[in-house]
């Protein structure tokens, strides 16, 4: 292949990579939920007790409760730090807008920090708490979310999203849970 042809192929590959990076994809959309997506994920679907009936008369099967409504957000921090990366602020802006929704006005929100399994258990626990608190601070400071509505806690690497790959980045996340009315 001549030098010009090689450069042309390289240019076409580069154009394809650029086009792929700006084209919306399902994974990019799920990694960057809208405020409406977050609200929908956090709004309880109705009463969830054993033996309770829904409005349609369908009885829930005992033991099928899945816990409080929640959503995992991939909020990037600087390496081994609770300092937010610039793209994390975009995600927090969307989260802040969602938490201001009238549908979530009376909700108490639990912010749960998770890490991957790199590092010691003690270090990961402390880091996950600091990261959850960093998210809480931004929501209170920038979006006027009432501080008493938000609780931060860390789980370290105790609840891996992908336990088969404990050091994978998918395990580094912040979980947002609606834990009930204020």
Regions found by a protein language model. Name each.
Residues 1-67:
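N-terminal targeting leaders that direct proteins to extracytoplasmic destinations
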Residues 50-61, 98, 115-124:
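Short N-terminal helix-initiation segments at or just after the protein's N-terminus
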Residues 64-69, 103-104, 144, 167-170:
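Extracellular/periplasmic catalytic domains that process cell-envelope and extracellular macromolecules
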Residues 68-80:
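Acidic/histidine-rich, surface-exposed loop or edge segments in extracytoplasmic proteins
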Residues 78-112, 140-141, 176, 180-182:
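Periplasmic peptidoglycan-binding/anchoring modules of Gram-negative envelope and division proteins
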Residues 112-182:
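Periplasmic OmpA-like peptidoglycan-binding domain that tethers envelope proteins to the cell wall
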């Amino acid at each position: 292949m001549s030098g010009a042809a090689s450069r042309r192929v390289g240019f076409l590959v580069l154009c394809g990579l650029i086009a792929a990076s700006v084209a919306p994809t399902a994974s990019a959309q799920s990694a960057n939920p809208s405020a409406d997506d977050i609200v929908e994920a956090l709004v309880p679907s109705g009463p969830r007790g054993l033996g309770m009936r829904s409005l349609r008369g369908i009885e829930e099967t005992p033991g099928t409760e899945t816990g409080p409504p929640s959503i995992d957000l991939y909020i990037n921090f600087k390496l081994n730090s609770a300092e937010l990366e610039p793209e994390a602020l975009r995600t927090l802006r969307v989260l802040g807008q969602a938490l201001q929704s009238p549908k979530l006005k009376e909700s108490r929100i639990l912010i749960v920090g998770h890490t991957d399994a790199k590092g010691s258990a003690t270090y990961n626990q402390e880091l996950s708490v600091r990261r959850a608190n960093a998210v809480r601070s931004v929501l209170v400071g920038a979006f006027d979310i009432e501080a008493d509505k938000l609780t931060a806690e860390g789980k370290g690497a105790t609840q891996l999203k992908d336990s088969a790959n404990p050091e994978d980045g998918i395990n580094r996340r912040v979980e947002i849970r609606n834990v009930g009315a204020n």
